[in-house]
Every structure is written in structure tokens, then in C-alpha cells.
């Protein structure tokens, strides 16, 4: 089974994140959930995003690197919203990356370098106001041009964190399909 590094959203490492991690662990995966906010959590996205901006993206990436330092090779990076941006960064640059799962975030505004042999799977609600049209397609094209599998899925509605069972955005039908697809992705490793 996979070693999954699961990175939280701008809300921080909440009970919802722990529930999601448990779901992957019950499927047999070794799941690590680094707290890149050092214990801070938020009830809404805006203050969480403000905190991330105050800390700085490069510092958050460094915290992920530090948390993964002793985990060995063959890591799958997954993340939710802000955590998807961190997972994407690790998948793009960490030589131990074997796969990337992006939930409710990710993408690039222009073509970029992607590691060969690091497949990526992304999940968004079609009318999510946090999704910038075209950026996920650019990431998929960049990964495919690197010779790796790249796929993304769109779900009905406008909910952002629709797979987090503790948020008002939660949509059980879409979340179940997302987890089914993500678990099938993890079974490849």
C-alpha cells in the first residue's frame, strides 16, 4: 500500500482532516498528516488563507519537507485546497514523489515542468468559485508532456471543500465518488 502525505486546507488540521486521513488508513495506506499551521485552525477560509499568506508559501513547503524527512522513498502527496498547492509543489520537485492527489485545488497558469513518472489526479466542483478555469488543464498538459498519467474529475455544484465531512460544503454523493477514485489511484502504488 501507499505512504500518503495528506496536507490540510487553509482551515488547518481539523477533525475533518483527521476523518479523511482515517478513511485512507482504513483502506490500508500509511497516512501522515503534517500540521503546517502548528496547531492553528480556522472556521472559515478567509482567515485561514490570511494566515497562510502571513506565514508564506515557501515556509509552508519547508514545513512539509521537514515533516517528510524521515519517511523514506515512494511517497504520494495529497492535499485539500491550500494543501493541494503544497502537494503539487512536492510532486513537482520531490524526487521521492510517486503520485499526487489534488482535492479542491491545484493547477498552473502557464505550462510548467513536471516530474516524469509522477501521475497526478485532481478533483474539483465544476462551479467552485476558488477554481481558476484553465489552470488545472495546464497542469494536466504539463504532466502529460512529461510522459506521465494525468487526470481530473469535475463534480456537480459549487461547493469548495465538498469532501470534508465537517464543513457546510460537504456533499456526500460527490465525496463518496471522489474517495472511490482516489483510493483506486492509490492502489496503483
Question: Can you say where each PLM-predicted feature lies in the sequence?
Answer:
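Serine-hydrolase catalytic machinery in alpha/beta-hydrolase-like enzymes
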Residues: 2-72, 161-166
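Alpha/beta-hydrolase fold nucleophile elbow
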Residues: 71-80
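Gly/Ala-rich beta-loop-alpha elbow adjacent to hydrolase catalytic centers
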Residues: 79-83, 87
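A conserved short beta-strand
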Residues: 96-106
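Short, proline-enriched alpha-helix->beta-strand connector loops that line the catalytic pocket
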Residues: 115-120, 147-149
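Short beta-strand/loop motif that positions the catalytic acidic residue
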Residues: 122-124
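Acidic catalytic loop of the alpha/beta-hydrolase fold
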Residues: 127-132
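C-terminal catalytic histidine-bearing segment of alpha/beta-hydrolase fold enzymes
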Residues: 149-189
Amino acid at each position: 500500500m501507499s505512504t500518503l502525505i495528506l496536507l490540510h486546507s487553509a482551515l488547518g488540521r481539523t477533525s475533518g482532516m483527521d476523518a479523511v486521513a482515517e478513511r485512507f488508513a482504513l483502506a490500508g495506506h500509511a497516512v501522515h498528516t503534517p500540521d503546517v499551521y502548528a496547531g492553528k485552525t480556522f472556521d472559515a477560509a478567509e482567515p485561514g488563507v490570511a494566515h497562510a499568506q502571513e506565514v508564506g508559501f515557501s515556509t509552508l513547503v519547508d514545513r512539509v519537507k521537514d515533516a517528510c524527512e524521515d519517511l523514506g522513498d515512494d511517497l504520494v502527496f495529497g492535499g485539500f485546497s491550500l494543501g493541494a498547492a503544497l502537494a503539487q509543489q512536492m510532486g513537482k520537485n520531490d524526487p521521492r514523489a510517486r503520485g499526487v492527489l489534488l482535492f479542491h485545488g491545484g493547477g498552473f497558469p502557464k505550462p510548467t515542468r513536471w516530474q516524469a513518472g509522477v501521475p497526478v489526479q485532481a478533483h474539483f466542483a465544476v462551479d467552485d468559485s476558488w477554481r481558476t478555469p484553465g489552470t488545472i488543464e495546464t497542469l494536466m498538459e504539463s504532466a502529460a508532456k512529461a510522459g506521465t498519467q494525468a487526470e481530473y474529475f469535475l463534480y456537480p455544484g459549487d461547493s469548495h471543500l465538498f469532501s470534508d465531512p465537517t464543513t457546510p460544503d460537504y456533499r456526500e454523493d460527490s465525496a463518496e465518488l471522489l474517495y472511490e477514485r482516489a483510493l483506486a489511484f492509490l492502489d496503483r502504488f
